């Protein structure tokens, strides 16, 4: 799978590689932002994006060694990446809030009978615990 990705990357032009690299870096920034806020569900994506960036950097260095000019500056749109991260984060937080509310609702619906608690307490008091006499010296 990685070999096919590298073949695809090697076929791209330098400009396309740089654009892809910057967009992946922006995506990584957004994912790290989500992780810091606590709204990242797919934590494995950070590792995948880092590997993809490394593959792109390798392809760029191969092109640089072959004599192509790779010193071009193309800026990524970090604002767009952050907006997408915030949108995804809001969805995740809403999902988490809904789950917690459901759990709380289920727990609060379970009613405990006070008489049952008293019976259990009395039964526990009536049980006698025998002391351990095996370790004592005479």
Curated annotation (Swiss-Prot):
Q: Which UniProt keywords apply?
A: Ribonucleoprotein, Ribosomal protein
From which source organism is this entry?
Mycoplasma capricolum subsp. capricolum (strain California kid / ATCC 27343 / NCTC 10154)
Name a single GO cellular component: ribonucleoprotein complex
Q: Name one GO biological process term.
A: translation
Q: Outline the segment boundaries, as ranges, of region: Unknown.
A: 80-138
List the Gene3D superfamilies hit by this protein, alphabetically.
1.10.287.310
Name the UniProt record assigns to this protein? Large ribosomal subunit protein uL29
A GO molecular function assigned to this protein is: structural constituent of ribosome
User: Which residues lie within the region annotated Large ribosomal subunit protein uL29?
Assistant: 1-79
Is the keyword Ribosomal protein in the record?
A: yes
* A Pfam short name: Ribosomal_L29
Q: Which residues form a coiled coil?
A: none
Q: Where is this region: Disordered?
A: 103-138
Q: InterPro entries from the entry?
A: Ribosomal_uL29 (IPR001854), Ribosomal_uL29_CS (IPR018254), Ribosomal_uL29_sf (IPR036049)
- The lineage's top-level taxon is Bacteria
Please report which protein family the annotation says this sequence is part of: Belongs to the universal ribosomal protein uL29 family.
